[in-house]
Amino acid sequence: ELLAARNRIVFEEFFSFLLVLRKNKDLAAKTENHFPMYETADTVRFLEQLPFPLTKAQKKVWGELREDMGSPYAMNRLIQGDVGSGKTILAVLALLMCAANGYQGAMMAPTEVLAVQHFETISGYVEKYGIAFRPVLLTGSMTAKEKREAYAKIASGEANPVSYTHLRAHETT
């Protein structure tokens, strides 16, 4: 009987958790998008210049991203895939769409190594394809002076996009 009661409590707690998740998802789906963005010649040109075509799956996700970013509702999207499956190029396209519509974008990474890799990838695209980015990196190993300089570029709008580790999201040095 004790085990049955415990199982019932666990079930009810989990069920309550699922209800809250569903409610939050429904609320998020109704959150107004105050910054709708639309595909521009910049993203089309960038795609045409790439030495490879997007895969069928990437084209599908890129279409969904464009639709979501132009939607009257805020986007909440996670791009999931294996290493090397092309997630970064999709994120870069979304960041380019932000920049082309006059907004700043940011690419958060769970580790400093990945944040640096994203920064280097984006910087490489700037050099190779002449895209309108002024990337900046923000990580924990940067000196206080480097962080202040990065924050100043972000605040002034000079930096776009920002590649950072998740720990930097709430830090104000």
What residue spans do the PLM features occupy?
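Conserved helicase motor
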Residues: 136-147, 167
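Conserved small/polar residues in nucleotide/adenosyl-binding loops
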Residues: 165-172
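Pre-Walker A segment
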Residues: 1-85, 89-106
